[in-house]
Structures are given as structure tokens and as C-alpha cells.
Amino acid sequence: MDMLMMWSICLFVCIFMAPFSCGSGSSSRFIQVPESQSIVENDSVDFNCEATTDPSTDLHYEWLHNGHQIVYDKRVYQIGANLHIESVQRGEDVGDYVCIAMSLSSGAREASPTAKLSVIFLDSASVQLLGSNRNELLLKCHVEGASGNEALQIEWYRNSAKLSSWQNIELDEHRLLVRQPTGSDDGLYRCIASNAAGRVMSKQGFVYQHQQQQQAGAKCLPRLKKNQKFLPESWGKQIFLCRGKRGGNVEAGLAPSPEGLRLVQGPDDQITIKEGEPATLSCLYEIPAELQNQRIQLRWRKDGKLLRQVELGASLPRGMGNPHNGHSLDGKDALLREDARLVLHKANGTLSFGTVIASDAGQYQCQLQMEGHLAINSSPGILEVIEQLKFMPQPTSKNLELDAAVAKVHCKAQGTPTPQVQWFRDGVNTTLPDQVEVDLNGTLIFRNVNADHRGNYTCLATNLQGQINATVSINVVVAPKFSVPPNVPMEIAEQSTVVIHCQAIGDPKPTIQWDKDLLYLSENNTDRQRFSFLENGTLEIRNVQAEDEGRYGCTIGNSAGLKREEAVLTVKTSSTGGGGYVTEESSGDGGFLATRAVLITMTVALAYIVLVVGLMLWCRYRRQARKARLNELSIKEAGGEQAGGEGSTSGNPKASEQEPCLGKQQRNGRNGKSKSNGDPQKSDDTACSQQSRASKKSAHIYEQLALPRSGLSELIQIGRGDFGDVFVGKLKASLVNNAQANDKDSDNDKQHSNSENGSGGSSGSTTLSTLNEKRRSKTSMDDIEEIKEEEQEQQQSQQQQQQDQLVMVKALNKVKDEQACQEFRRQLDLLRALSHKGIVRLYGLCREKDPHYLVLEYTDWGDLKQFLLATAGKVNTATTATSSTTPLPPLTTSQVLAVAYQIARGMDAIYRARFTHRDLATRNCVISSEFIVKVSYPALCKDKYSREYHKHRNSLLPIRWLAPECIQEDEYTTKSDIFSYGVVVWELFNQATKLPHEDLTNEQVIEKSQDGTLKWTVAESTPESLKEILLSCWSVNPKQRPSFSQLGAALSKAMQNSE
């Protein structure tokens, strides 16, 4: 309680003094602030931010977008202090960005100036009419887009000629003004807008006709109502306004066509012609002599739209006349386009086609019109085109991605009549493979693409004209994927060596290309003495220099596509360091800001003190209530036992605080009988002991395992496990002898403990005496051999008493993690309960202070997996420094069988003790120079063997070694250990050079394991006599798996046959 009060007072002082120590502590200032930018949509953008402080590593950076903290994903992420946005979107990323630099020591925050991000895009353009009369024509180019800080470029075109400010034409930004327009200004007006995002033309232009503007008149005439004959006298001086209907067309008042002007002959009613042949449409006309000087136009229309026209009478300098009965023509009413195939003959009005194409089919009509008069129309004629049989477009070869759900290859044929499309494989009249079909449109559909779909496919199109075919090649490829992507941002010291991994899989085999800051790297443009491009794609840089710092990108690609990942390399130079500085505040507002800061700080500190005092009172009340309950329970128990228990625990109250994992079992040992009296009220201190149900003598057992921390020496870290670091070191010989003596005492204590607990204990504690009897009866499958081995061990132990013992030390760092503590106790109980040659020995437990140390037996050759890799030539030496540097020869089949047999014996001992291992693999076994293999439990899941573990349901699991029921239901039994043992034998015959199912990702392994579709096969070098029993180890049904005794018998028989 006193410590808590002192801690609260210190915290209050720190909070109170925080506003006055900003200048001399770890305050920060920006040396690089983010700048406002305009980015083209779908491009990437980087906002740079850098602050300095003392020390320089005391900063944490955050980014705000429009006042809200950014949630990072694959598109928006932070690289160091900088913010990177991939594929900018105008709907999500536009706005204000602020960089926040926060000191981790003082909590002070500094915000950078706001940087604005604007997106440049360009969607569409259209021409709008703002005004049109006899004096001027005003058009506007309306653009859907944005150009940021740059101006939008607008270009105007009349027909196909580009316009500029000249004579009566003025261009002002988006507007076009034509002053005093004449017939020479007639035409189709379009605009083109362009910026950094691209260039777009208006989809619809504006057609201006000067003659129509002059002759247009309103058809709205003033008239009286039906029941009104006279105007009221009061209306004599009124002004009446006549308006046309809003949105309607204003038509010109046209006179009937003059006599004598007529069409003599129009096009035929039905004309049928083959595609590619010439065609002629007739239109004979007569013009009287008195009308020769009038302006008369001959027009051809297709499907109601103007196609061609020509002036027959007096010609104007320029213009299109007055087509379409006085209505203005826009893009929808005209088909005027440059086409050399179409020729309109002025002499006889004939429209001729050089070669007919399919799009020429339609309804044609000839029209004759005199200026200011109604048009004369011929009867329509239908042009029908017999289209040639052809592919539109031609089918092309294609690469299909393996395992794609659906892939399509199109084959579209056109012709008259409509052709029928068929597909064949490797020639004509051959059937298509499975999961390949053809739809009604002639599209070839592949479902669940696999390697059997490779080949040549022929598309055959037939109709009455004949048949045509096209052959395409279908290749099944695997898109490139990163098997080992580049590392996350790395920091490396100058003149050291860095390895940036980049490995890829795919079919065809992907090529790997490195670049630095978007500049390609190769052996020609790099220092070959420092840069090495390994065969698997990894980039190695030796003797790192300051100029090597940057962004390294790895691009993988094959015919199926490209993928790219980046890694940021930061080089720490010897001169790197932070200089102290003092932040100067303005003198004008300094006093007010300081006063406000002090008031806020004192208010927060006062509220915090009130909260702490309240918690202290509540904790004191809880502790007194708990003591009262414990005293009440102690009175009900035997008096002598109560006094002894209190003396063992209350005498050292700090021990339980320092030992959160094992101290609970001590208290349970004192109050062990309270669990059987049926009292529903149980204290918080016994919660963990209720789950473990250890005996009340467990404290005495742990005391027998106690080892002084000073007995350990030469500790070298070899990795990190799930609950702490793992070391290799040496244990004094005297402590090893004491541990061997304590083993005998612990066996007696176990029997005594079981007799006291009776039948009310758990399965693990009640069977210890039975286990010892079985161990002494020597009735298991390896009893006879163990008798001989024990004699050899006694001789070896006498020789080793004079030298220190090589040990493995597992540290429990996560003392507050209940799950880690539970697993620590499980491994401790497992190794403490077993005494077998195939299992590593438990020498003791160091629990004087945090972290706890679990001291286990270790061997001179280290873990089995590294030994297998060394014999396969994959590594140079074994794990430990004491191992020999002489290359090891490859293992023979007899040696592999011997290793598997020893592991089976050790696992059979675990089974007979009614324990499960849960992580059996070659990495968790050790081997000595005497070729003795023992089952151990390093479990280096955090670094060395992190690839062999996967986080599933908030736990790191070796999913490639686990049975399906372990992944689905978290159910571990001896049968699940047998499943893992089958994988271990697979590793042994493969020399541990491969991962099980290395062609599948971890997620795919989990999915197939849960579906029961994960297929296992034995290694190629496995003896025939073992294949059947090893395959049964991987049975989905646990009851169909063999026992370890059966596996040991099969291995023993195979060893005899191999000899």
C-alpha cells in the first residue's frame, strides 16, 4: 500500500512538472513538414515528415486526415515517419493532412502545419449554348474534372479546324464568342479539355446554322378566347407578350415547294447486295429554268439522319444550308463523316458506294429542298447487305491462371445468315475435356482451370456461305506469388551485412528484378564486391554504406502478370546523434498558456489522486474480507496442519508476488483440503490452483527442484519460445548430482502425495504411484533394453560428475500471462513426471526472481532438425559451438530407422505417463554425438522456426504437424501425437529439407485439414514395410491410428530387415 502511494505521488509530481520541462526534456520540432500536393487520380503520393529531439529515438509519429486519425490498410500505410497513399481516390483521400510527433518519454505532442491533397481528374466535356442571336454566338465548354493548382487547357474546333482568337472569334478560358456570325461560321463546334490526368473531347457538339437563325420565327399568334369577341376598353393600352413553349423547337414558317421542282425517280424499294461489292442508289430530279439561280439542296438520308448533301442552285461561300425542314442539326440528326466509299453525283443525284460494308444496311431516302420552302421527299428504299462470313474479332491465344473458377475465350463470327460456332480440341471432331463447355454465343468456358486444359483449341464457324476456323493455344499458368516477400522496414549499422529476401513461386518460374528508389539494379550497375544477387532472388549487401539507404523494390513476373513489394533500408551511421535544443515560445502569450497548462494539469492530477485513494480503500476492504474467509476456513481444518501451512507461506509474503505462476500452487498446498469440503466461496488466490488441482505437497516438490541461478554459466540465447527466451549454457556438476539425488526423493513424495489425495485428485496426480510401479516393473516394449541402458548411464554419470553439464534453459518472461503460465506448468509437470532415456531430464527450476528458469538436459549436437540439415549438406555445422566442424555424412536408412525408433520409445513413455506432447517435431528433439535421440521441448516459435508456426485463434500452432481435431476443436490426445509422429518420420526420410505441404499456404493447410481433403504421402525412401502403418498415422479418424508400441514394433522389424 505504501509503495502504491509513493508511486502515485511521483506520478503527480511528473504530471505537474510536465508543462515546465518541455523545453529541456524530450520536446520535438519539425525539420521537414508535409507539403500540399496535387496528384493525378490513381497515382501514389508521399507526405514527408521528420522531427528532431534528444534523444532522436524518443519519437512516435501519427497522421490525421481531416482531423481524424488514419486507419492504415494495404493502400494507405506509414513508412517510418512518412505517409504513403497508393492509388489516390478523390472520394476518399482529398482533404487536410497533419503529422503528429509525440515524445514517448514525456507524452508531449507537436502538430505540423496542414498539408492539402487535391486530386487531378478528367471525366467528360460537353458544349453548352449560353446565347445565340444575330449579333453573337456564345458557347461554353463544361468539363467534369479538376486540375489542382494548374489551369485546365481548352481547345475549340469547328468541324475539324482548330480555332484561335482571330477576327470575330474570341477565346476566353472555357468560353467561345463569335461576334456578328455569318454563314462562314456554320458548322459543328466541339471542345477538347486536357490536364495532367489526360485529354477528353466533348461527346456532343453544337451545330450552328446562321441562315436558320435569320428565318426562324415564332408560330405563337395572339388570339382571343372562344367566348370573348371584343377586348375590354381598359385593355386598349396594354402590352401583350407572346412566348413559345419552354423546351420546344421554334420552327420557321416555310412555303410549299414551287411548281416544276420535283423528283423524277427515287431509290428502289429493295436492294440486296453482297458485302464488298459496289452499289448505286438513284435520285433523278428536275429543276425549272427560272429556279436555276435559287439555292436548292439535294440530300440523302439514312434511317432519317442526313448522310450526304450537295448544292444544286446558287452556291454560297460556305455552309450546310438549311437541312431537315428548318430544324437545327446536332450530332444525333446527322451522319456527316469523311468516307471515300460514298460519292454523291451532283449531275444526276445518284449516291454510289465503292464497296458495301455491313454497316451500310438500312433505309435510304432522297430529298430535294429549295431555300425557304418545304422539302420534296422520295419513297424510301431498303438496302440489304449479305455479310461475308468472318471472325469479329479474330480469336487469340490466352494464358489461363491455374485454379481460376471461370475463364473464357471468345469466338464471335458474323455473316448472313447467322453462323453457328463450334469448338474442338487438337483438331476437328474431337471432344472437349471435362469442365470445358461452349455457351450459346460461341464462348469457350473453362471452369476450375487445371493443367489438363492446356492445348490447342479450334473455333469452327459455319453457315450457307461455307465455314472458317481459327486455332488458339491455351496455356495454364500460375500467377507469381511471394513465397518470401521483402522484409518490413529494416535498420542496419554501417559496414555490416544485410540480406533482403525475395523469393517467388509461379509457373512459368517468375523472374525477379530488384530496384532501388525506382532505379533498376543489376550486376552491371552495382558494386559486385558488395552486392550479390542470389539464385533464389535474395539480395545481399555487404559492407553497407550510407548511400545504400533507400527503398528497395522487388518485382516478380511471368506471363501471368507482375507483382511488386518494397522494403525500406535505413543505415545507422557512426555520426548519427541528436543535439539538444530549447524550444523558444513567444513572450506575448507565454504567461496565459503557462497558467492554463498548470490549471489543467492540477485538475487532472487531483482527479487521479482521488481515483487512486478510492482504489486503495477498495483493495484494503477486499483484502480484509479475503483474510476473514481464509481464517474461517483455517479454523475448520486441522489445527496443526493450519499452523504449519501458515508458517510456510505467510513467512515470506513477497515470494508469492515474485512467483505468480508457481506461488499459487504453494497456497493451494496449504489449503488443499478446502476444495473438498464443498464451500462455494473460494478466494482469488486459489483460482489457478483449482484448475490445475495439484496436491497439497506441490510446494515441497518445487522446492526439491530448486536450483540456484548462480550455478548456471555461459548462457547463449538460441531463440525465443511462446513464453520467453531459450538459452544454452552449462550447469555445475555438483548441482547435477543433487538433481539426480532429488529425483529419487521426488518419486517417494509423489507416491506419498497420491496416497493422501485419494480418489478425489485429477488423473495426472492420482496415477503417479501407478506410473512409478510400471516404471519399476519393466513391462513395456523396451524394458530389457532400458535395464542395459541404465547400467551404461550409471557408468557415464560417474565420468560426467567431474565436469559441468550442458543444459537448455527456458525462461518465463510473460509472468502475467495466465495462458503462458499454464503452458509453463504443463511442460514442467510433463518433464518432472518422466524418467526415461528417450526424454530429456529436468535438472531443476530457478525461481529466485523473474524470469523463472526451467533447466533441461541438452546434447552436444543440438536439435535434431539442424543435425538432419547438416547431414544433407544444407548447413555447415550443428547448433552449438561445441559441435564438430567436420562435415557429417548422409544418414543411411538404418540410421534413420534407429532415430525414429528412439523417438517412438520416448513418446511411448509419455503415453504411459498419461501425458501428451502437443508439439512433436524434429526441431523439438535433440541428438548427441553418441547417436542418442531424446524428445525435448525447445519450441522456438518466435524466430528460428517461426515459419513452421502459424497464429490460429490467438495461439501460435505448428499446423503442418497437427491432427485435424487439434485445429478444429483444440483437442490434444495421444492419437494426435501419433499423427505428429508420422510427420516426424516423413521429416527424417526427407532429411528435414522440406516443409510438409510446402506448396500450400498456412490458410490452405487449415482449410484442407478441416475439410478432410489434406492428402499425405510417405517419403520416397521409406521402406515398403512401413508405408502402410505410417499412412494410418494420418487417418482422419483418431481411432484408426496405431499406438506407439505398434509403431515401435514395426520400426524394430524394419531395422532387422535393413541389417
Swiss-Prot record:
UniProt entry tagged with the keyword Ribonucleoprotein: no
Cysteines engaged in disulfide bonds, as pairs: C49-C99, C141-C191, C283-C366, C411-C459, C502-C554
Stretches of the chain found on the membrane's Cytoplasmic side: 619-1059
Keyword Transmembrane helix: yes
Residue intervals passing through the bilayer: 598-618
One cellular component (GO) term of this entry: receptor complex
Keywords tagged on the record: Cell adhesion, Cell membrane, Disulfide bond, Glycoprotein, Immunoglobulin domain, Membrane, Neurogenesis, Phosphoprotein, Receptor, Repeat, Signal, Transmembrane, Transmembrane helix
Modified residues (Phosphoserine): S698
Pfam families in UniProt: I-set, Ig_3, PK_Tyr_Ser-Thr
Biological process annotations from GO: cell adhesion; cell surface receptor protein tyrosine kinase signaling pathway; imaginal disc-derived female genitalia morphogenesis; imaginal disc-derived male genitalia morphogenesis; internal genitalia morphogenesis; negative regulation of canonical Wnt signaling pathway; photoreceptor cell axon guidance; positive regulation of neuron projection development
Disordered: region residues: 639-695, 739-781
Biased composition (Basic and acidic residues): 742-753
Annotated compartments: Cell membrane
Domain Protein kinase per the UniProt entry, residue ranges: 712-1055
Glycosylation sites: N42, N348, N429, N441, N456, N469, N524, N536
Record topological domains on the Extracellular side: 24-597
InterPro entries linked: Ig-like_dom, Ig-like_dom_sf, Ig-like_fold, Ig_I-set, Ig_sub, Ig_sub2, Kinase-like_dom_sf, Prot_kinase_dom
Main location: membrane
Polar residues composition bias: residue spans: 665-693
Origin: domain of life: Eukaryota
Membrane topology classification: Single-pass type I membrane protein
Signal sequence extent: 1-23
SUBUNIT field: Interacts with plexA; component of a receptor complex that mediates the repulsive signaling in response to Semaphorin ligands.
Function: Acts as a calcium-dependent, homophilic cell adhesion molecule that regulates neural recognition during the development of the nervous system. Component of the repulsive Plexin signaling response to regulate motor axon guidance at the embryonic stage. Also component of a receptor complex that is required in the adult visual system to innervate the lamina layer; specific targeting of R1-R6 axons.
Protein family according to the UniProt entry: Belongs to the protein kinase superfamily. Tyr protein kinase family. Insulin receptor subfamily.
Protein name stated in the entry: Tyrosine-protein kinase-like otk
Organism: Drosophila willistoni
